[in-house]
Amino acid sequence: MYNAEKKQPTYWQRLKIAFQYVMPQLYLTLAAGWLAKQKWGSVTHFIIKLFAKKYRVNMQEAEKTEFKDYASFNEFFIRPLKADARKIDENPTALCLPADGRISQYGHIEQQTLLQAKGHSFSLVDLLAGDTELAKEFEHGEFATIYLSPRDYHRVHMPCDATLRKMIYVPGDLFSVNPFLNEHIPNLLARNERVICVFDTEFGTMVQILVGATITASMSTVWAGIINPPRSAEVKEWTYSGESAVQLRKGQEMGAFQLGSTVINLFQADKVELANHLDVGVPVRVGEVLAYKK
């Protein structure tokens, strides 16, 4: 696990942090969601082109490489990739990374505490919406957090074959989750809106969490569709068994963000060993090795 001495923010950085607390997070997010759905023809194509240029989006790996082929910004943002754009590691003892992005944090869960960033830890119980029994399953386990920037591919995939046990929607804040704010806003990942997916796998119980953020207009899964909006003020839980059981294969798409955010994976103690090439800030891609079976 990575941890280093935390630098004090500058005056302008403190203003940036303060703005996160006072800005109308929900209204900005709703407005962004509405705008991203609009189909304005050449205006939409121009906006997409500007965005792709600013963030250096690699359009050659997308199924549709031309900006004019996207009717809305949302359609562009969750663009599928060509079939050969991501290679899924075929080693049966390996779990794969679920998303493109950068490693934000990773390592050992100390009892029921995860490292968020330099100088900040947060409670596993808080992250799991107060579910103490579920949290106990991951005491002394392993975790990995991936930050998806605006330029990244925003569909989320499965690290391994799995059976969905339950899904939990947790209402919360909509702070930005970029690396700077992740370092300076306490408990950020346990405060933000999120969708918790609990899976049974040959590697033990695995949790994969989609964390929302400012202007993340919606999160979706392949089995339930769009989870939010509408946004609930209460925690919601769905269980899956029998006829409603959901089976997913390694590398299969399981969800998506409409605008960027964060994915967190949790593994039980003594079940997996995180790959030694992982490091904070390192860019990663879907299908690369995340961990190996112990």
Curated annotation (Swiss-Prot):
Site for Cleavage (non-hydrolytic), residues: G260, S261
PTM comment, free text: Is synthesized initially as an inactive proenzyme. Formation of the active enzyme involves a self-maturation process in which the active site pyruvoyl group is generated from an internal serine residue via an autocatalytic post-translational modification. Two non-identical subunits are generated from the proenzyme in this reaction, and the pyruvate is formed at the N-terminus of the alpha chain, which is derived from the carboxyl end of the proenzyme.
Active site (record annotation): D100, H157, S261
Cofactor(s) the protein needs: pyruvate
Enzyme Commission number: 4.1.1.65
Biological processes per GO annotation: phosphatidylethanolamine biosynthetic process
Subcellular localization: Cell membrane
Enzyme class name: lyase
Record's catalysed reaction(s): a 1,2-diacyl-sn-glycero-3-phospho-L-serine + H(+) = a 1,2-diacyl-sn-glycero-3-phosphoethanolamine + CO2
Gene Ontology, cellular component aspect: plasma membrane
Pyruvic acid (Ser), modified sites: S261
Function statement: Catalyzes the formation of phosphatidylethanolamine (PtdEtn) from phosphatidylserine (PtdSer).
Protein name: Phosphatidylserine decarboxylase proenzyme
Provenance organism: Histophilus somni (strain 129Pt) (Haemophilus somnus)
